[in-house]
Amino acid sequence: MRDLIKQFVDQRLSRRDFGAGLAALGFSASAVQSVVGSLAHADEGPVAAPLRMEGTGSEVMLATLQAGGVRNIFGTTATGMSPFFDALALQSDTRMILSIAESQATSMAHGYELASGETAVLFVPGVAIPSTMNNLYNAWKDRSAIAVFSDGPSNQLPGRDAFQQMQDWLEPMDRFTKWVWQVDNTRQIGEMTRRASQVAGTAPGGPVHVRFPLNILGAPGVRTTVYPQQNFHVPVEMRPKPEL
């Protein structure tokens, strides 16, 4: 399916052959028309230029979210998140909407996704994952797209049983999410941040969870290229037939 779409978008496959390929995969005639109609608009508009940057892990994470159109981040505060707040203070395009408790912040992100139809972003302390899970269950049942990020103890000294920390909060979060991951390499900060938003927002929607250890969030001198997400967005909504 992926190769078929790429050939069509790259104009190496005709509309007729692309439709025949979809039909061979089991798509109905109406589904074929909807997919072809959506892809026909995928390359409209100017292609935004990528951003080559160097900064902390948190600055890379924030720049990646902004490249995906994120302007609101919900969450609470904690010491382990301080590198991210430093990154927020250096810009004015994205705002942090704070709550006094993680369960409330989760409900705010859930409501934002339901009202706006956009993937919500939630950033909470790793020690507050149990509080987050209380209301994340509701978002999971509603199939609400929420990219949940959390901090964590440094991965350079694992197994120290840090204060109020569990070595692995991913396993309990797996029950109420589509996908969980811990970023242990600075080269994957942008990649996994993008993937979190993409997986959460891909139908059927649902929460995802990505954990960033403190040394990854605060890592200096991270070099990367941030690509605007609209360059890769392909509409997948079913288009109605005007004649019907």
Model-based region annotation:
Residues 4, 33-34:
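A generic structured-segment signal
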Residues 14-32:
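N-terminal export leaders
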Residues 24-27, 43-244:
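N-terminal alpha/beta PP-like core and its mobile active-site loop of ThDP/TPP-dependent enzymes
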Residues 34-44:
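Signal peptide processing junction and immediate N-terminal pro/mature segment
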